[in-house]
Amino acid sequence: MRYSRLFGKTQREIPSDAETISHQLLLRSGMIAQLTAGVYSFMPLAWRSIQKIETIIRQEMNKAGCQELAMPVLQPVEIWQQSGREAPFGQTLFHLKDRKDRNLVLGPTHEEVITDLASRYIQSYRDLPQRLYQIQAKFRDEPRPRGGLIRVREFIMKDMYSFDASPEGLDDSYQTMKQAYESVYRRCGLESMVIDADSGAIGGKASHEFMIVAESGEDSIIYCPKCSYAANAEKAVFKKKTLSKETLKDLEEVATPGQKAISDVARFLAVKPENTLKAVFYMADGKFVMAVIRGDLDINEVKLKNLLKCNDLRLAEDGEVKAAGVVAGSASPVGLKNILIVADDSVENGSNFVAGANKDGFHLKNVNCGRDFRADKMADIALAAEGSACPFCDGTFASKRGVEVGHIFKLGTFLSERFGANFTDAEGVSHPIIMGCYGMGVGRLLAAAIEQNHDEKGIIWPMPIAPYQVYICGLFLDNPVVRESAEKIYKELEAKSIEVLFDDRELTAGVKFNDADLLGIPLRLTISPRNLDKGGVEFKLRRNKESELVPLDSIVERVIATIKSESDL
């Protein structure tokens, strides 16, 4: 491809609304163009990389015994009502009506459609197992699209669905997909982590996320350096500090003028934060909830939402807190009625806590769960953090940031039961099909690759997913010798099926080098009068600072060998 014919332009300025590195570099390199919030066009360079990623995905899916199909984007809302997932997805669903006033949604995922297909075409154990996948656009009305391709409203996704006759069959499908996903990321030249994850609105009994480690990632990865445990912070469990049990003392009300934050109250009363209880107020599907937790811990809102089995959870506003009769800054569950109290299990680990007196400017000493208040629900609703104790060894948690690029779920039978997707076993007994689902964000993977592979000058593409393998930088192309040499190398490489972007523009060396670094093509060949006078071509890998002069008569062989070594991942 001649750069002079390439559709798209680079830009020097960093767009003001681009926060993540991948968003900045994708826009600056002219690889994507925004149409509206969370909706992008893939320009030719980016689309070449997308196609390479999809090819790797297809190869690994097919190797794992999957069959590709294509399902409709338009879905009748009735199948979402049948599955019971219309409410959990809520406003994320794009709703529309056709000319006959029928309600439809744009598919955010395809569990409903594939389960409907399974109910029609799988009748016997002889029809199992099945593994079906597609690569297709999905639509989700994200409230705050951000990060370029990281969180968008229209995106490309590979979704695969497994159908098995037994839990052991599901385990096999799950492990096969786990290995296939790891192969995809490895072949794309990326470092990934597999972590425990929350199933969210998709549902299911177990799930894992695949993370590309990157400093600007939107997800927090909690892991133990001493053992193999790793999880999304939303899911992570940890060993909470054990407090000594004391003889229960009588409640005592004390004045705490102006002390509202836990840290201030603890300091004022000369106690440690873990010897206090704090209350956080939420609205769960419109119902007021008080969440109570030990003062040294924070609420994990995902765990809380799962415990409450609600579709919408948010912090209560000031007016809602007042309407509930709660005094912010001095609140506790002691003496409260007609309010749903949810407590973290840490409140049972300790005694004689300091908590709010439900009276402005006052707190209670010697508050004890069971004696002074009872929780309507009690479970682990605490957020793990760096420094938390690992529950599986004596290690201490560390944390990384990451970009989620894949999520796999053991769905079980809850969808097949709702859609009547059953099979008959060898004895003629009917059973619901056991399902798994496996998603991979293709556009996210592209962005994550940049998050993990860049420097201050631009992108550094891994060879397997680079839009082009070689960047020929011709300098002083008005010189006939340079022009002839550049054209000759370009044609010889293309004849060997090497993917080449030939910068044939009449621009300065500085502009060309800057664009080469920004675009991040893995291998750059610089052809100039000075290099030709020395009998060679400047050969440079994008990820290296050093370059070398390679003789003209061996440059093609050197390029081929380098591409092979860089692609063998």
Swiss-Prot record:
It is found in: Cytoplasm. GO terms for biological process: prolyl-tRNA aminoacylation. It comes from the Bacteria. Its EC number is 6.1.1.15. Keywords: Aminoacyl-tRNA synthetase, ATP-binding, Cytoplasm, Ligase, Nucleotide-binding, Protein biosynthesis. It holds the Pfam family tRNA-synt_2b. One of its GO terms (molecular function) is ATP binding. GO terms for cellular component: cytosol. InterPro entries: aa-tRNA-synt_IIb (IPR002314), aa-tRNA-synth_II (IPR006195), aa-tRNA-synth_II/BPL/LPL (IPR045864), Anticodon-bd (IPR004154), Anticodon-bd_dom_sf (IPR036621), Pro-tRNA-ligase_IIa (IPR002316), Pro-tRNA-synth_IIa_bac-type (IPR004500), Pro-tRNA-Synthase_IIa_type1 (IPR023717). Signal peptide: none annotated. It catalyses: tRNA(Pro) + L-proline + ATP = L-prolyl-tRNA(Pro) + AMP + diphosphate. Gene3D superfamilies: Anticodon-binding domain (3.40.50.800), Bira Bifunctional Protein, Domain 2 (3.30.930.10). Catalyzes the attachment of proline to tRNA(Pro) in a two-step reaction: proline is first activated by ATP to form Pro-AMP and then transferred to the acceptor end of tRNA(Pro). As ProRS can inadvertently accommodate and process non-cognate amino acids such as alanine and cysteine, to avoid such errors it has two additional distinct editing activities against alanine. One activity is designated as 'pretransfer' editing and involves the tRNA(Pro)-independent hydrolysis of activated Ala-AMP. Homodimer. Consists of three domains: the N-terminal catalytic domain, the editing domain and the C-terminal anticodon-binding domain. Belongs to the class-II aminoacyl-tRNA synthetase family. ProS type 1 subfamily. This is Proline--tRNA ligase.
